[in-house]
Amino acid sequence: MMLTFNQYNDVLKFEGEQMTIGNPVKILLVEDNPDHAALVIKGLRSNNVANSLVHLEDGESALDYVLQRGRYADPSTSPRPDLILLDLRLPRVDGLEVLRILKSNEDTLRIPVVVLTTSDAEMDIAKAYDYHANSYMVKPVSFEHFMELMKALGCYWVAFNKCAE
């Protein structure tokens, strides 16, 4: 059965203002551009997708958070995310290196990583998939298309996708 974006709302179960099927999803957004981060957050929230969202601005902080090191060592205050939205062009440690490290670590390799970037360079796409990205999405220029992308991303990764425990 094929659903349009408008039909997704008829299928999804809403709890409060959050889109959920099963347990709420913890999302980590790794984005250094504050305007892009604001758009992602707005897009997710306006589509009732942002269950629990942590925003970090550089690759080193993202690695510390996901690997629970340093100031993020306590899993009760820094739980591992269920989904990572990862930009490629990041300060301190670039997104491809973050992806490579996470997907080569036994404790984090099953966390879905969606590359969400402005780069449509074939080399970046190929390298991301070489490092086992679960999806590669190019940020649209149009605000309307960006909001549609966030809704589709949320519907798939938050509501429909089933991850390994």
Residue ranges and their predicted role:
Residues 1-28, 34-54, 60-63, 67, ...:
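Non-catalytic signal-transmission and effector/linker regions of two-component phosphorelay proteins
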Residues 75-79, 103-110, 131:
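Conserved phosphotransfer cores of two-component systems
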Residues 87, 117:
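Active-site residues of response regulator receiver
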Residues 90-93, 102:
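Hydrophobic residue at a beta-alpha junction
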Residues 91, 109, 121:
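The feature encodes the CheY-like receiver
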